Amino acid sequence: MTLFDRSWYNRGVVEKVFDFCTDAQRHKFFDQVGPFENMLEQEGVHLIKFWLNVGRAEHLSRFMERERNPLKYWKLSWIDVEDLNRWDAYSEAIDETLSKTNLDHSPWHVVRADDKRRARLAVMQTILSQFDYAGRN
């Protein structure tokens, strides 16, 4: 099992919000997602996509904790701080990215992630529901 955190979907969200890519590059990305994901699945990859959705207040709370905690400070970057100032642009980019890359053969599973424990359980439950295994029922 391989987990990708953020991965190439950044092209649709972060790169759009911060002008790290052109509109043409972003639209090309959207055009390539379906064929690429389809190719992966034809090669035996079982692709399960999750969007862990964190609300604005929780987002701020986590950033403040990272700022105060020397063991978590390394997780905080200038882009993270700027995120809150661009919340509306992020929301639009996320909605568009999820809409354009939510495909029949590889749908998104949007998980409310303000509560980390519940979010992790929801992700595990979804992953396990995708496979047959001894003792499943």
Language-model features: locations:
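Conserved phosphate-interacting/catalytic interface
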Residues: 3
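Residues immediately flanking
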Residues: 6, 52-54, 113
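Long, contiguous hydrophobic alpha-helical segments, chiefly transmembrane helices and signal peptides
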Residues: 12-13, 111
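A glycine- and Lys/Arg-enriched "phosphate-lid" helix/loop adjacent to the NTP-binding pocket
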Residues: 14-32, 40-92
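Arginine/glycine-rich "motif VI" loop of SF2 helicases in the C-terminal RecA-like domain
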Residues: 39-43, 100-103
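NTP-dependent small-molecule kinase module
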Residues: 90-137
